[in-house]
Amino acid sequence: MHDKTWSGRFNEPVSELVKQYTASIGFDQRLAEWDIQGSLAHAQMLTRSGVLSENDLTDIRRGMSEILEEIRSGKIEWPLDLEDVHMNIERRLTDKIGDAGKRLHTGRSRNDQVATDIRLWLRDQITVIQNLIQNLQTALLDLAEQNAEAVMPGFTHLQVAQPVSFGHHMLAYVEMLGRDFERMTDCRKRVNRMPLGAAALAGTTYPIQREITAELLGFEQICQNSLDAVSDRDFAIEFTAAASLVMVHLSRLSEELILWMSPRFGFIDIADRFCTGSSIMPQKKNPDVPELVRGKSGRVIGHLIGLITLMKSQPLAYNKDNQEDKEPLFDTADTLIDTLRIYADMMRGVTVKPGNMRAAVMQGFATATDLADYLVKKGMPFRDAHEVVAQAVRHADEAGVDLSELPLEALQGFSKLISDDVYGVLTPEGSLNARNHLGGTAPEQVRLQVKRWREMSA
């Protein structure tokens, strides 16, 4: 008997170097449980279609149950000579149950088999990821609710722009993660299409009933073109793109946490368990976790580019190139899952420093726009108000004080429209409360948005 299922065509064995270079068992063995799921459904369909006997099905189920137990207990071996997870499991099954194991592959190719395995695996990973996204959102919502009144500088160009609520800032990331959740839901629709039954590329001559297999495996749709079914990796690229966006959002938050934790900002502190020290500088507390998230985002984005490049020049249908889809896909899911898990825990360990944040607001003329709006409401055209306030800011800057610290006489020197009610406008808290509309930064709006998100995820 040949050591490979296809070696009867060849006059010489494959070299050891080629075996090592082309084998995928080192990484695709993680698909084993999903491969068994697909095989059991395929066997049941073949039995109902009259291709396999009931005895064959009974033997296959028994053998697969034993193999699954070996996999979960770590007792199974994965010989390199058998190339991949599919051939390893088939050989193990045949060793256990004999000819019924050889019949299992009837009407099926590894091409549609592996495409099915990946989709089954990825479908489960998306479920895990979506649960973790919601868990992180909950951590951010808790922070937002606790700090709805905490005022901080909002930035544009990393320069102080206007006062915002820290809670409002956290809600911005809740919104981003909400879109990420939606993208995963949308991606799952295209992942959840069954290629099994396409065989190598043209379908099969056996009387298969793909609807039965799809129902058994929980696929909502069936791939309608056999060529496309075995060669499509759009779903993998789409998932990696969605995962890249999640990592981009977490990288942006990481950058802010790193800045805010630095003494130059001093807005927050991160719990010790997420930081490390220095081997030479005793005073150091380094935000390693957010820094590493920032770095790992590039890794996931790199996988996206790799998968796109992998597919760009392939003719129909299946090509060996596609073996290279698994490692970037696996690593993308692993990295994202690990990052989401640690991030939710880390955000629950963030300590906010409202006093430092408010002091920073007072150093950047953050209420200048509020003064301009004040003058507009008194009847001054906005462009004129903009110019007047710019002059007032320059004067305050030269005097080394905030706008709210200028005496009334000085402010009236820029416009007689200004009266003593202006000081209610120039405080950071007044600025927050004035923006009390849908999407605004007022504490009342922050609480309403927190409530809305909690109700949506309940």
Curated annotation (Swiss-Prot):
<dbReference type="Pfam" id="PF14698">
    <property type="entry name" value="ASL_C2"/>
</dbReference>
<dbReference type="Pfam" id="PF00206">
    <property type="entry name" value="Lyase_1"/>
</dbReference>
<keyword id="KW-0055">Arginine biosynthesis</keyword>
<dbReference type="InterPro" id="IPR000362">
    <property type="entry name" value="Fumarate_lyase_fam"/>
</dbReference>
<keyword id="KW-0028">Amino-acid biosynthesis</keyword>
<dbReference type="GO" id="GO:0006526">
    <property type="term" value="P:L-arginine biosynthetic process"/>
</dbReference>
<dbReference type="GO" id="GO:0004056">
    <property type="term" value="F:argininosuccinate lyase activity"/>
</dbReference>
<protein>
    <recommendedName>
        <fullName>Argininosuccinate lyase</fullName>
        <ecNumber>4.3.2.1</ecNumber>
    </recommendedName>
</protein>
<dbReference type="GO" id="GO:0042450">
    <property type="term" value="P:arginine biosynthetic process via ornithine"/>
</dbReference>
<keyword id="KW-0963">Cytoplasm</keyword>
<dbReference type="InterPro" id="IPR009049">
    <property type="entry name" value="Argininosuccinate_lyase"/>
</dbReference>
<dbReference type="InterPro" id="IPR022761">
    <property type="entry name" value="Fumarate_lyase_N"/>
</dbReference>
<dbReference type="InterPro" id="IPR020557">
    <property type="entry name" value="Fumarate_lyase_CS"/>
</dbReference>
<dbReference type="InterPro" id="IPR024083">
    <property type="entry name" value="Fumarase/histidase_N"/>
</dbReference>
<dbReference type="InterPro" id="IPR029419">
    <property type="entry name" value="Arg_succ_lyase_C"/>
</dbReference>
<comment type="pathway">
    <text>Amino-acid biosynthesis; L-arginine biosynthesis; L-arginine from L-ornithine and carbamoyl phosphate: step 3/3.</text>
</comment>
<dbReference type="InterPro" id="IPR008948">
    <property type="entry name" value="L-Aspartase-like"/>
</dbReference>
<comment type="similarity">
    <text>Belongs to the lyase 1 family. Argininosuccinate lyase subfamily.</text>
</comment>
<keyword id="KW-0456">Lyase</keyword>
<dbReference type="GO" id="GO:0005829">
    <property type="term" value="C:cytosol"/>
</dbReference>
